[in-house]
Structure formats: structure tokens, C-alpha cells
Amino acid sequence: GMGGIGKTTLAQLVYNDSKVKSHFEKRVWVCVSDPFDEIKIAKSISGDGAPSSNELDYVLQCMSRSIEGKRFLLVLDDVWNHDSEKWDRLRAPLIQSGAHGSRILVTTRKHEVVDMMRATSDMISLGELSEGYCLSIFNHMAFADREVGESKAFEDISKKILEKCKGLPLAFKI
């Protein structure tokens, strides 16, 4: 989905959910952005046991050991690069070392990234929120849930602001 639509926020809700926390032995969040850096990602997955070396094969071995036999959740947030060669180098040890039931959740704006990842589950495409949802969220954030529905002035101002935000939650969060 487009920027500001709520991909990262939704992924954070999943990542921080108590059932998700108890289901996975290891959870890792990596803000990827651009460029797609396999060494940075592998070191993030390795956590405290990350090597100081920047030699890719060695870093990938350390990453493999850190997840060996563990059910993990890896969130790769804001992936732009769709270079399948780089992804395959990182993906292979993740699949080989992690326990059955491990998951990789990816947020991206680009359909090419989804194709490159060869996802085994469906992509969830987020769209703009309806006017009603936007108004509800905006009022919650702007007025801390005080009763604003009875005030026509507040309602008109809220609607004018939301028209400019075009259904993007990040726009009215700012």
C-alpha cells in the first residue's frame, strides 16, 4: 500500500500482540528501507550474538545458529529492493534453520517485492480508510474521546481536515 496507509502500524500491532509474543521463541523487527543490506538484516536477527565481521557467509552462519530450531517471527519493514539474488541469499538459511511455523512478515509499497519474496500466503493490500473510520480515529486522537459529535463546529472542522488527508491515517496523525 501507499505511504502513510498504516502498513507499519498494523505490523507493529501484530508484532506486539501477547499471543504472538508467546507463540514465537524469537521475534525480530528490522527496518530495511533502501538499500537492502543482507549483512545488517542478518546481524539484527543474530541479536547479541552478532559477529563484528562483515563477511556475508560468516554473518549468515551466525544468523543460522541464532535461530536454529527456534520458531521465529521476522518483520522486514519498508522493503523497497526487489533483487531476488540478495533475498535468496538471506532466505535460504532462514528456511533451513528456523523451526516449522516460523514466519516472515514484510511491509512494502511495491508489488515487485511481493513477487520476489515468493510468498506462501496471500498479500494483504491496505487501502484508504472510509470517511467514518477516519472521523472516528481523528476525533479519538484530536479530542481524546471527548464528546464532539454534539458540536457541529467541531464536526465541520474535523471533516474539512479529513478531506485534505484523503483517507491516510498518517496524515491526520501528524
Residue spans for each PLM region:
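Non-catalytic, charged helical/coil tracts that couple and regulate nucleotide-powered enzyme cores
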Residues: 45-54, 99-102, 106-174
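Short alpha-helical
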Residues: 5, 36, 82-85, 112, ...
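A conserved switch/coupling segment of P-loop NTPase cores
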Residues: 16-23, 58-129
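Alpha-helical elements of the RecA-like P-loop NTPase motor core of helicases
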Residues: 22, 39-40, 88, 115, ...
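Post-nucleotide-binding-loop coupling segment downstream of the phosphate-binding loop, primarily
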Residues: 5, 9-61, 65, 81
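P-loop (Walker A) phosphate-binding loop of NTP-binding proteins
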Residues: 2
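Short, conserved phosphate/pyrophosphate- and ester-handling motifs at nucleotide-, phospho-/glycolipid
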Residues: 7-8, 77, 107, 168
